């Protein structure tokens, strides 16, 4: 089959109109405009655009440029600036807007780590959401930390907190209970963030903006109350933005999301992104075991013996069924 000819990217006016080429890092993305911190200046940030036909080879997303990207841009005599190239990414976090959507967006790129902020009360973060985020981080080689916020609301339910903490720490994840209200865990959070570029993600209403305000005094990001009717937050962050931390490093704030659709996974790969399932699968009788019904499946045996949590296995099945709708069922 003949290959389609590739159109030449025309990401800016003609080179003759441009008076300088610069490089920098994208620190803010609103979807239609990007702010770039220039390498060759004392903290100068300039607004840039990309042309509508700008695309990265091999990746089709709603945002061709993501916060954290290293970019090349042309600045023109009229003051406008256009991004002309994006350097190869070390890694990134990508998601589908919803389970029904085929469009994907990159939350951030070139990360040293990511933190999922979850809450066990007001609102409750679903374990499926947690597991989908962690699986995506595994898939794209981004070390993940689980931050459990609003621990001050769990004074009468610390057993739940300890159970969730034990579950994810036993798998191998770092879990940090924090409270922006009491200050619990904030010093540990600073230790993990120092000198690193870290994405912060989570459902709306889990307190991401409040935590960032505590970590960066004077920033004053907008926060919002939780709906008493639906126990959900409202979106106060509407675009991704990168902030320098006063103790060194960068933190990337992203809009709160209600769902986390995975992308670019095959059914055979999904188990690789659940560390405890992947470890158990070494003992399966068949190399192509789906861990759903096959005889001699070591994963199903581990599930039966409570060495794999039912909630984690359910999350594994949910991703399988998202890829191949309705094919996989929990064992009876």
Question: Where are these predicted regions, by residue range?
Answer:
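Short boundary/loop segments of OB/S1/cold-shock single-stranded nucleic-acid-binding domains
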Residues: 1-22, 74
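Helix-rich effector regions associated with P-loop NTPase G domains
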Residues: 17-20, 32, 47, 57-77, ...
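A short macromolecule-binding patch
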Residues: 43-53
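Conserved beta-strand/loop subsegment of P-loop NTPase cores
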Residues: 110-118, 141-151, 171-178
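Canonical P-loop GTPase G-domain recognition
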Residues: 153-206
């Amino acid at each position: 089959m003949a290959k389609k000819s590739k159109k030449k990217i025309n990401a800016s006016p003609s080179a003759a109109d441009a008076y300088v080429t610069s490089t920098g890092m994208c620190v803010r993305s609103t979807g239609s405009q990007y702010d770039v911190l220039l390498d060759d200046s004392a903290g100068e940030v300039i607004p840039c655009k990309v042309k509508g036909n700008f695309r990265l080879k091999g990746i089709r997303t709603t945002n061709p440029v993501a916060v954290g990207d290293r970019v090349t841009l042309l600045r023109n005599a009229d003051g406008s600036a256009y991004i002309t190239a994006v350097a190869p990414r070390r890694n990134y976090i990508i998601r589908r807007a919803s389970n029904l959507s085929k469009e994907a967006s990159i939350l951030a790129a070139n990360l040293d780590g990511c933190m999922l902020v979850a809450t066990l009360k007001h609102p409750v973060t679903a374990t499926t959401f947690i597991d989908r985020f962690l699986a995506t981080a595994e898939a794209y080689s981004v070390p993940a930390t689980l931050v459990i916020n609003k621990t001050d609301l769990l004074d009468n339910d610390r057993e739940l907190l300890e159970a969730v903490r034990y579950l994810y720490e036993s798998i191998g994840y770092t879990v940090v209970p924090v409270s922006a209200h009491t200050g619990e865990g904030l010093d540990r959070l600073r230790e993990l963030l120092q000198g690193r570029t870290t994405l912060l993600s989570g459902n709306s209403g889990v307190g991401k903006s409040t935590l960032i305000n505590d970590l960066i005094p004077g920033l004053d990001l907008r926060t919002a109350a939780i709906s008493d009717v639906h126990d959900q937050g409202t979106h106060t962050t509407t675009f991704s933005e990168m902030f320098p931390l006063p103790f060194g490093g960068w933190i990337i704030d992203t809009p709160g999301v209600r769902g986390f659709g995975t992308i670019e996974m095959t059914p055979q790969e999904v188990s690789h992104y659940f560390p405890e399932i992947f470890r158990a699968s070494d003992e399966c009788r068949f190399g192509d075991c789906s861990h759903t019904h096959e005889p001699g499946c070591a994963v199903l045996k581990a599930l039966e013996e409570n060495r794999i949590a039912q909630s984690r296995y359910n999350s594994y099945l949910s991703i399988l069924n998202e890829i191949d709708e309705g094919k996989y069922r929990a064992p009876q």
